[in-house]
Design a protein with these regions (language model features):
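PAPS-dependent sulfotransferase catalytic core
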Residues: 216-265
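Phosphate-binding beta-loop-alpha motif at adenosine-nucleotide cofactor sites
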Residues: 37, 178-205, 246-250
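Short, solvent-exposed coil/turn elements at secondary-structure transition points
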Residues: 97, 124, 188, 220-223
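Non-catalytic, well-ordered alpha-helical segments in soluble enzyme domains
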Residues: 55-60, 197-209
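A short coil-to-beta-strand element that immediately follows conserved catalytic motifs
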Residues: 62-66, 210-215
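Substrate-binding/catalytic groove segments of enzymes
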Residues: 207-211, 268-270
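PAPS-dependent sulfotransferase catalytic domain
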Residues: 1-184, 253-282
Length: 282
């Protein structure tokens, strides 16, 4: 009888604690009109490109030249980036998890610490892991099965199951404590209703954007349109994954058992996702 390998739960929680007490970035970078928080491989570039296109139309400013992140940074950049358009809303984006004090009611309400509204973009963790592996498999140099087990210390991979669960856990707590300031968007819902959710994102940031500009931005964000706006100088040439198998097909029975055990033990909120696996032929 095969015995599953013990989960490195203690190492995971220790790494989360170290990160949670040492990452002051979001407490430091507070003076923005809105902050886009995105789980890695959740459609960050796509959402930023659509938002940037809509803002450019609304404000009569140059649209992003290419779909790559650098072009969208003109409107939604790293918190440390200088502001390019003074008349545009000041927006920033990051993949970061917040400091342990970030969701302190005493700090926010008792001491009156200003924090901007946040939009948190998440994705089914199983699909995000496949996407990350597809992008970085040459660099990782391991099988998907090995990659899936990850590194709870956060050193081996750019993103893995442990980093994904840490992100989901921390932002679930923030959303639970401050629901009015935190708007969570699932990638799958954004795919199904991009115009509706793009409008809600701007509304959450209290930014007025005309409906026709949102519609035009969604059209610009189609795969065909984005494929025509790839930067010829960029090494990134693909908009979609090389392997078009459904993400669930990457996981064999042993992988599914490991994933189920990890999320059951370590994930505190499922973010509305159904972790059951599709039945073959069903």
């Amino acid at each position: 009888m095969r015995h599953p390998q013990p989960l490195p739960v203690n190492a995971f929680h220790w790494h989360c604690l170290r990160r949670d007490v040492s990452n002051f970035a979001l407490l430091k970078h507070r003076h923005f009109d809105g902050f886009l928080i995105t789980m890695q491989h959740s459609g960050t570039h796509w959402l930023k490109y659509m938002m940037s296109s809509a803002l450019a139309l609304q404000l009569e400013l140059p649209s992003p030249r290419f779909v790559h992140n650098d072009s969208s940074n003109d409107f939604i950049g790293h918190p440390r980036h200088p502001r390019r358009y003074p008349d545009a809303p000041r927006l920033a984006s990051t993949h970061s998890v917040p400091h342990a004090l970030f969701d302190s009611r005493l700090l926010r309400l008792g001491l009156g610490l200003y924090l901007p509204p946040y939009v948190v973009l998440v994705r089914d963790l199983r699909a995000a892991l496949v996407s990350n592996y597809e992008k970085w498999k040459e660099r990782y140099g391991v099988s998907f099965k090995t990659y899936l087990r990850g590194d709870p210390r956060g050193r081996r991979y750019i993103f893995d199951i442990w980093g994904g669960m840490h992100f989901l856990n921390r932002w679930a707590r923030v959303a639970q404590r401050f629901p009015a300031a935190t708007f969570e968007v699932r990638y799958e819902d954004l795919q199904a209703r991009p115009e509706v959710l793009l409008g809600r994102i701007f509304a959450h940031f209290d930014i007025a954007v005309a409906a026709q500009h949102i519609a035009a931005a969604v059209a610009a964000g189609s795969k065909a349109s984005m494929a025509d706006k790839l930067d010829p100088a960029s090494p990134i040439r693909n908009i979609i994954r090389d392997d078009q198998r459904p993400p669930a097909d990457w996981y064999d029975a042993e992988d599914r058992e490991f994933f189920d055990a990890a999320v059951t033990r370590c994930l505190v909120d499922n973010h509305g996702y159904d972790w059951r696996w599709p039945v073959a032929g069903g």
